[in-house]
Amino acid sequence: MTLQVQSAISLKPFNTFGVDVQARLFAEAHSDDDVREALAYSVEHDVSLLVIGGGSNLLLSGDVQSLVLRMASRGIRIVHEDCLESIVEAEAGEPWHPFVQSCLELGLAGLENLSLIPGTVGAAPMQNIGAYGVEIKDVFHSLTALDRETGELREFSLEDCAFGYRDSVFKHQVARWLILRVRFKLSRVANLHLEYGPVRQRLDELGIDKPTPFDVSRAICAIRSEKLPDPAVLGNAGSFFKNPIIPAQLYATIKQQHPGVVGYPQDDGRVKLAAGWLIEQAGWKGYRDGDAGVHKLQSLVLVNYGQASGLQLLNLARRIQSDIVERFGVELEMEPNLY
């Protein structure tokens, strides 16, 4: 057995909230064989398996009695290419932003709007991560996952993944599928998405009227760095709540009471609201209770000022949820996975 299983390991370095909880058992998977060994170990020792990547979409409310398996596999390769596009495959443990930069350096466009998002390649499809008008589903080709029930590998197409807003089949069947590697369809001819105002504005400020994918990536990195705190400095998991999608009738009611609300009509007739706007209107921006708080510049981000526990952060999130329901009749859904 090559898998190294350790006991009583602090997970503080492995979650971006910096919550100091302990894993009963911990191991890192650098290969498919390591993953299979971890599954076998969990069965043999009758212990559940918790798979993590970069820990950037995770809120740990207490010590974890599972075998925590951190995906640490690395590798980026082009598996198909022609004059217009390439299919790039990356191992699940590849850090996301460096992967995006590697693709840009290869002259491949499509991922630039997803620059500086924390996490790993394997976690990206689970959430169907998205930013500035682009989601994973827009550049996704296929992925390979291990069926934890049978031990067999399965290939997933775009349709198989059932991608939705910050959603996929893997989020609902997390105990079954373990993503090993992901393939992306990227273009050699850039089709830039500049419809989000801040991106265009930043490019204008830089005097760039004919941007390249690299330019877009740099602009988005600058915007994100200003808007979102660095987890290495201030513990956080990025946007903590999903932007709610509500019935048009409820939106009309809110609009009547709060004329400043901005809604984004959806294809199904519903309207998407900015969760950050709701939270800010309710007075939570900059709120702090001990070391758990809401960021002073970005109300969508909960932060750990140092020694907050996962339970304290969770309780704060629930208080915000209750207040938003009471004020607006809107339910906010948390983005991070709770354990």
UniProtKB/Swiss-Prot annotation:
GO terms for cellular component: cytosol. GO terms for molecular function: FAD binding; UDP-N-acetylmuramate dehydrogenase activity. Pfam families: FAD_binding_4, MurB_C. Residues 19-189 form the FAD-binding PCMH-type domain. Keywords: Cell cycle, Cell division, Cell shape, Cell wall biogenesis/degradation, Cytoplasm, FAD, Flavoprotein, NADP, Oxidoreductase, Peptidoglycan synthesis. Its EC number is 1.3.1.98. It comes from the Bacteria. The keyword GTP-binding does not apply. The active site is at 166, 239 (proton donor), 335. Its main location: cytoplasm. PROSITE patterns: FAD_PCMH (PS51387). Its cofactor is FAD. It catalyses: UDP-N-acetyl-alpha-D-muramate + NADP(+) = UDP-N-acetyl-3-O-(1-carboxyvinyl)-alpha-D-glucosamine + NADPH + H(+). Cell wall formation. NCBIfam families: murB, PRK00046.1, PRK13903.1. HAMAP family: MurB (MF_00037). This is UDP-N-acetylenolpyruvoylglucosamine reductase. It comes from Pseudomonas savastanoi pv. phaseolicola (strain 1448A / Race 6) (Pseudomonas syringae pv. phaseolicola (strain 1448A / Race 6)).
